[in-house]
Amino acid sequence: MTMRFMTIVKTRENAEQPSPALIQAITKLGEEAAKQGAMVEFGGLLPTAAGARARLANGKITVTDGPFSEAKEVIGGFAVYDVASKQEAIAWTRKFLEAHIGLWKQELEVEVRQMMDAPAQGC
């Protein structure tokens, strides 16, 4: 039985864009994970200036266009893995971080979170 994990890549709002060499290294790793049946999906996100934030507070919904200057860190990318254990998801995350060594000078953090199973149909 496998479990799905989402890895959430956190970086600074003003982080540099990845170099072509880094994109190539990440793509190669994603292809390797896909060949092994571990990778479901992965991708990078545009800066928050291209996005919006929706919030529910006190029964009211507000939407704010980016950028979000108050954010110290933002989500820069994600990956979804279908693996046998949290340890395997962490191993793929380590490989992802290792791919950045020498190609990314800024701090990077990746959160590994197990995804909930979808509810059964007809419930």
Residue map of PLM features:
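Conserved, structured core segments of small domains
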Residues: M1-C123
